[in-house]
Regions:
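Von Willebrand factor A/integrin I-like adhesion domains
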Residues: 98-101, 573-638
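DG-centered beta-turn motif at the end of beta-strands
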Residues: 173-177, 188, 216, 496, ...
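Acidic, polar low-complexity linker/tail segments
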Residues: 25-44, 120-171, 180-184, 497, ...
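MIDAS-like acidic motif and immediate structural context at the N-terminus
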Residues: 50-57, 163-188, 527-532
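Acidic, Ser/Thr/Gly/Pro-rich low-complexity segments that form flexible
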Residues: 225-248, 294, 314-337, 374-375, ...
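Structural recognition of the beta-strand scaffold that forms the well-ordered cores
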Residues: 39, 70, 169-174, 211-215, ...
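Small/polar beta-strand repeat architecture
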Residues: 246-274, 279-412
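Short amphipathic secondary-structure patches
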Residues: 2-17, 55, 59-66, 71-135, ...
């Protein structure tokens, strides 16, 4: 709408300037005293004025001709796909399609008596059509000349479609990241749905036209296709026990401030070498919530040793060592392990020392739930989590032990601050790595990446739509799009390619792509974004060197992107597509010329003529329409 408004205002501004010039010209003639000049002026002025304002109708006619050409091209394609050979039947099919295509333009009248569809000797369907455009200005009566122009302006178009046309597969890759919110997303939906009508034709025989839609943000949501593309995540093992202590707790009645400090605890029952966890002490609080080794003095007292990183050393509880005086209370509990960490029992857990685990659904010891831990393997059925559970409650039943490695249902990792984080596997995917990173090799031979998304940068709800000729299904998906997340444009680019690649047909057998054959199949990928690609991955998690806008560092993994910068990955993928003869169009919505985003889009596109940088919603619609027309022209002869 903004583009049309600007064009109309441009015409009126031109008319205004012409009017000022005419006024100045008239003033000069008014001062002219010679009669013949005044007479000529009086006769010519009305003509000059009407010619000036008639430019409005000329502009409208030009716009209508573009719309008529689009409608006639589509109608001719429909006639060419029909099984008919007589002009009568071809005209019946073509006119029906043309009438439907022109319903959006109520101000024009189709001249059916001057619309023809015929088949020539070279099996080319030839169509000609005219419409009448009602004039707004130029039908004024000009005494003594009469009407300056008729009430209607005739506008014509011509189209030819070779019946040996091509099948069409188009992938539409759409940026639905957080920056696309508000009016941008509204504009995108309008433009994308208009493109669907241009590309996907109602008649699918003898040649088909199909479109896939790939919404992307932090990744591409594959929905039910995810397991087949990146593998089924490893599930959990059931937990049957979790404990860290043995025996009863023993009350503390005193601790001296000495080196070593002596603990008084009547009938404590501890032996030298036992490990204990001390808590609840008042006054000398510095000793609380720590693991110690016991040195027995007698049945009522013992001293403590602490692990210094290499050995057990005497605990000095003097004031000079930072300890306050004991006042009351406290308990000591005997531990199963030297660090007093929780031992989890899960048959066949499959974990090794230094692996990570995520625990959930434990009853009783509920404090252990919802966190990731680094483990020490004890046996094939037990492991410790290197953390004490004194405040977590006592285990009663149940629980799930999830491996935390790449490929598991949960990814447990350390972030750049070395804190342990845990994220669930989503149905989104990340980039493929290895030798097939920039090819369309089948996912059966080279899996794509898992995606572990966090709650502040989530997997988009809209999932991928493989090739379809159902315009309602395609438009419903477009209408459902919502914005959120950062920009993994390289992943969207990859899946644009994959949806038109026959190597991925095993994912969607009923929506598979045709075998590449330039004679009867045209493939195109349209990549749309509004900014920088900023979200590469390492081991399924956003890499620590991801660019600004990719989320906070808390939920990034402490390794750099395996495949490098998102832009570099996108460029390599585009090169791979173009090498196969796939036509690549790029659309940078409100992307500044000269920016890094504009540069990569230009490099990705098949040529400079295939790269667009629309600055407004109206410009975006115009860009998509231009792409749709270009794709259509590749299938028709004129």
């Amino acid at each position: 709408m903004n583009g049309a408004y600007d064009q109309i205002m441009g015409v009126f501004n031109w008319i205004r300037s012409c009017g000022r010039a005419t006024r100045d010209f008239a003033a000069r003639f008014q001062r002219e005293t010679r009669g013949n000049v005044a007479m000529i002026f009086s006769l010519s002025l009305p003509v000059l004025v009407l010619m000036t304002v008639g430019g409005v109708d000329i502009h409208r006619a030009s716009t209508v001709r573009i719309n008529l050409q689009d409608a006639l091209d589509a109608a001719t394609l429909a006639a060419a796909r029909s099984p008919y050979t007589t002009d009568t039947d071809l005209s019946r099919v073509g006119l029906a399609a043309l009438r439907a295509n022109l319903q959006a333009y109520p101000d024009i009248t189709l001249r059916e008596d001057q619309t023809t569809f015929s088949l020539d000797n070279d099996s080319v369907v030839v169509a000609n059509s005219k419409v009448d455009v009602k004039t707004l200005v130029a039908n004024l009566i000009l005494p003594p000349y009469g009407k300056f122009m008729d009430d209607y302006l005739p506008v014509g178009a011509h189209s030819e479609v070779n019946r040996s046309s091509k099948n069409l597969e188009v992938a539409l890759v759409l940026d639905i990241t957080g920056s696309m919110g508000g009016q941008r997303l509204t504009d995108l939906k309008i433009a994308a749905k208009d493109l669907v009508d241009l590309v996907v034709q109602p008649v699918q025989t003898p040649f088909y036209s199909r479109m896939s839609v790939i919404p992307y943000a932090v990744g591409v949501n594959l929905g039910s296709y995810a397991n087949s593309a990146r593998g089924t995540p490893t599930s959990y093992r059931s937990i049957t026990g979790a404990t860290w202590t043995t025996g009863s707790s023993r009350s503390i009645s005193g601790i001296t401030r000495a080196s070593p400090g002596v603990v008084t605890s009547s009938s404590h029952g501890f032996a030298t070498g036992d490990w204990v966890w001390v808590s609840g002490v008042k006054g000398m609080t510095q000793i609380n919530d720590r693991a110690f080794q016991v040195v027995k003095i007698n049945n009522s007292s013992y001293s403590l040793q602490a692990w210094n990183g290499s050995s057990w050393s005497t605990v000095n509880t003097t004031s000079g060592n930072g300890y306050s005086s004991y006042s009351s209370a406290g308990i000591a509990r005997k531990c199963l392990l030297s660090d007093c960490s929780v031992i989890v029992t899960a048959s066949g857990h499959g974990l090794s020392t230094n692996d990570y685990v995520y625990i959930s659904n434990v009853s009783g010891m509920t404090g252990i739930n919802g966190s990731g831990y680094q483990v020490t393997e004890l046996t094939s059925n037990t492991y410790s989590i290197r953390e004490n559970g004194a405040d977590w409650g006592s285990y009663s039943s149940g629980g799930r032990s999830y491996c935390g490695q790449y490929g598991c249902e949960y990814r447990v990792f350390r972030n750049p601050s070395n804190a342990i984080r845990a994220l669930p596997a989503s149905t989104c995917v990340s980039e493929r790595i290895g030798a097939q990173a920039y090819t369309d090799a089948s996912p059966g031979s080279a899996r794509v990446g898992f995606n572990y998304a966090n709650s502040s940068n989530t997997c988009p709800t809209a999932s991928i739509l493989p090739l379809s000729s159902n315009t309602s299904t395609i438009k419903n998906l477009i209408n459902s799009l919502s914005d959120d997340g950062s920009t993994a444009g390289h992943i969207g680019t990859a899946w644009g390619w994959y949806t038109v690649s026959p190597n991925f047909n095993a994912l969607w057998p009923s929506s598979g792509a045709g075998v590449r054959n330039e004679r009867d199949l045209l493939k195109a990928v349209i990549i749309m974004t509004d900014g920088d690609y900023n979200t590469p991955y390492c081991s399924g998690v956003i890499a620590q060197n991801a660019l600004s806008g990719s989320g906070g560092s808390t939920d990034k993994i402490n390794c750099n992107a395996t495949n490098g910068h998102s832009f570099d990955q996108a460029r390599a993928l585009c090169d791979g597509m173009k090498a196969q003869g796939i036509i690549v169009y790029t659309v940078g919505f409100q992307v500044s010329s000269g920016s890094s985003a504009a540069a990569i889009l230009a490099q990705c596109a098949t040529s400079a003529n295939h790269a667009y940088l629309p600055a407004s919603g109206a410009d975006l619609s115009d860009s998509f329409k231009a792409i749709g027309r270009d794709i259509t022209r590749l299938r028709i002869s004129k």
